[in-house]
Amino acid sequence: MRTHILLFIEGETEEVLFPAIIQYYRSNYNCQEVEFHYKNLRGIGNYKSKAKGILQETINKVKKGNGILKVVICSYDSDVFDYSHNPPIDWKLLKKKLEDITKAKNIVLMPSIQSIEDWLLSDMEGLCNYLKAKKPRNLPGKNGHEKIKHLFKLYNKVYYKGYDSENIVAR
């Protein structure tokens, strides 16, 4: 019986990064027996409206193939909620609703504390190689996204969140 994992993501950059990370682990640690399903909900608000239906659909598909859905991971940017008195999603309630569908306690909430651009900045050498640029002394900006936009602008380029991150990760 093949093991399946469903990973909910909320944006284009995650759609590029998570498969690359999993491919890295598969090729380096012999993790071929697990099948991953990525579902881009295209925004945090769609966790409420789409996640339950997609989960049920995935469970049915996995059962048809004699597999088992072991884990559901909900990845989201936590910075959206940092200063909100009334956050748009009650994550505990969503987790409970998803657990009711799976009949198990295998729902993992995975808030991203830093943006994916912050991860990309941790490989400044690779980023500069991609741009064919020299490593800057410092980058202004309050977060990784602003810093990468500034770096691209220094070299007369525009940073496109999904597209450029895919090319950067591929290198």
Residue ranges and their predicted role:
Residues 1-4, 15-41, 52-171:
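C-terminal accessory helical subdomains adjacent to catalytic cores in phosphodiester-
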Residues 9-15:
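Extended, compositionally biased accessory segments flanking or bridging domains
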